[in-house]
A protein has these predicted regions:
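Junction motif at the cytosolic side of a transmembrane helix
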Residues: 2-11, 64, 243-246, 256-281
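Aromatic- and glycine-rich beta-strand/loop motifs that create alpha-glucan
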Residues: 10-51
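Hydrophobic alpha-helical transmembrane segments of multi-pass membrane transport/permease proteins
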Residues: 41-68, 87-97, 204, 257-263
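Pore- or pathway-lining transmembrane helices of multi-pass membrane proteins that form conduits
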Residues: 48-53, 191-210
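Hydrophobic alpha-helical transmembrane segments of multi-pass membrane transport proteins
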Residues: 53-60, 82-156, 182, 200-201, ...
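Short helix-capping/hinge motifs at transmembrane helix termini and TM-loop junctions
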Residues: 61-70, 98, 153-161, 189-191, ...
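Alpha-helical transmembrane segments and their short interhelical loops
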Residues: 127-199, 246-270
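Membrane-interfacial helix-loop-helix junctions in multi-pass membrane proteins
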Residues: 207-264
Length: 281
């Protein structure tokens, strides 16, 4: 009798697994579609502003100031790299970072504010599905903006692609890292003003001090050593290495740093969801 009951229980569990997988896939795809449609629906807020901002950066720093600076480094092909060529990868990465972060922080906090996040929490979807859906939506916006800024940069300078895998993987890792950070910000935020605190006082300074506009190797000590504590430095330089073949730091070490951030932040976000921090009232 016990054998029959055990066998029946096993059959029920085996039959339930495909249903759970299907539920997870449906939930994940639904969140991703919702986030993508949101970005496209309000494109004048999500796509146009960063495009205008980066165009101004290219004009002011690249054309007006960059023409007076001259050569910044020597490329992988032995050709000199002008200032506008040097900052172009950093500006692309800056747009990816800011938009990946901003998308998920505002979207998930909106879900909290409108209280429909509670419906997701009581659904059969596990926490990682909710997190993956919102992160994928943020990465999608980062991809859209990054491609647009890349296209705009072609009006001001030529863009190389020396290491396609390095370029794409760095883009994805950076977008995921700052999407996870934006998720944490949305979790702890209690009002809409809290969403702007981290980008204003943390994200913007780290971005400007992350080697976007200058070569970190040229900094005097101890500022050069202090700059290596900035995680954005590793993303910007690895992305620059993928496009231009030059970097201030070892790309292998940069990958270690970025992967460590993805694992640590991902685990922390899932833990926050399971504990219901900032989600359950």
């Amino acid at each position: 009798m016990n054998d029959v009951a055990t066998a029946s229980s096993g059959l029920v569990q085996a039959a339930a697994r495909p249903n759970l997988v299907r539920i997870n896939l449906v939930g994940l795809s639904t969140i991703v579609r919702k986030e993508t449609r949101r970005v496209v629906r309000i494109w004048i807020q999500t796509i146009v502003p960063p495009a205008i901002t980066m165009t101004l950066y290219f004009i002011i720093f690249g054309q007006l100031i960059g023409s007076r600076i001259g050569q910044m480094a020597q490329g992988a092909d032995g050709q000199p790299i002008s200032y506008i060529e040097y900052i172009a990868p950093g500006l692309i990465m800056m747009s990816v970072i800011q938009n990946s972060y901003g998308n998920i922080s505002s979207s998930f906090f909106g879900a909290k504010f409108q209280r429909f996040v509670e419906e997701m929490l009581v659904s059969p979807m596990p926490g990682w599905t909710i997190l993956a859906g919102y992160v994928a939506g943020a990465v999608m916006r980062g991809l859209m903006v990054g491609v647009i800024v890349l296209g705009l940069s072609l009006f001001f300078t030529k863009i190389h692609l020396y290491h396609p895998f390095v370029t794409l993987s760095t883009f994805l890792l950076a977008a995921v890292i700052f999407a996870l950070l934006g998720f944490i910000n949305a979790i702890y935020a209690r009002k809409f003003d809290d969403i702007a605190i981290i980008p204003t006082f943390v994200l913007t300074p780290l971005t400007y001090l992350g080697g976007v506009f200058y070569n970190v190797a040229q900094l005097p000590s101890p500022w050069r050593e202090i700059s290596h504590a900035n995680p954005i430095l590793y993303m910007v330089n690895t992305f620059r290495y993928g496009l231009l073949g030059v970097s201030d730091i070892d790309p292998a070490w940069a990958y270690v740093v970025m992967l460590a951030f993805v694992v640590a932040l991902g685990a922390f976000c899932i833990n926050l969801i399971h504990r219901g921090v900032g989600l359950r009232t």
